[in-house]
């Protein structure tokens, strides 16, 4: 559970850390968007090289990102299996009832796995190098035009900030409950999938109670400090673009242009 990196910020002084959070968020959104249009090995190789370069620029060990992939391994595997057995095409390599393994299915499964991993790694770069409050402030700034149509942008960014802070707290709380139950003889790693699923059920009630208690404590703390309206909040750190952000946007534009060129000319 402690390997889940969503919502965890690792302080640092790398080039990526110093970027404006809006730059990192825009870059992540653009990367995810272009990855959904990737149709060749060349575009996946180019995207993988871009992600590896971004990780190197964070000056953080790659093991940190690899550990972040482990908790969602089964989700990736499930998605890959669906693509492998349910993608139509020819030739058929294996046929067992309604399940078919085809060459297009294998290729599509590999593409989906690579796409999944690269998108998660890029999203992890954003969360590991940007504090949750900065992510929320960046989102509020980017969505500011929606205020004209009465979208509660400030409240949405506040909710995102709180949610991102709660994710690692809930994971740590889950690990504590699991350790306490293991000390009483409970096993979470033995038996089949059904037995393991049943072993997780006793975790839910104390975890749910703990989450409610943390939410109540947070609400009381905000009320004591006089918090009333998110729209009236001031910012301790004002967001501003710098020379690093201009360089990042140039690099991002270059990546996108090359990606489109590869995707268009290499199939």
UniProtKB/Swiss-Prot annotation:
One of its GO terms (cellular component) is plasma membrane. Residues 1-25, 93-100, 172-246 are cytoplasmic. Keywords: Cell membrane, Membrane, Transmembrane, Transmembrane helix, Transport. It is found in: Cell membrane. Changing residue 225 to E: Abolishes folate and pantothenate uptake, EcfT does not assemble with the A and S components. GO terms for molecular function: transmembrane transporter activity. Pfam families: CbiQ (PF02361). It is a multi-pass membrane protein. Residues 47-71, 122-150 are extracellular. InterPro entries: ABC/ECF_trnsptr_transmembrane, EcfT. HAMAP family: EcfT (MF_01461). Forms a stable energy-coupling factor (ECF) transporter complex probably composed of 2 membrane-embedded substrate-binding proteins (S component), 2 ATP-binding proteins (A component) and 2 transmembrane proteins (T component). This complex interacts with a number of substrate-specific components, including FolT, PanT and RibU for 5-formyltetrahydrofolate, pantothenate and riboflavin respectively. May be able to interact with more than 1 S component at a time. This is Energy-coupling factor transporter transmembrane protein EcfT. It comes from Leuconostoc mesenteroides subsp. mesenteroides (strain ATCC 8293 / DSM 20343 / BCRC 11652 / CCM 1803 / JCM 6124 / NCDO 523 / NBRC 100496 / NCIMB 8023 / NCTC 12954 / NRRL B-1118 / 37Y). The lineage of its organism: Bacteria, Bacillati, Bacillota, Bacilli, Lactobacillales.
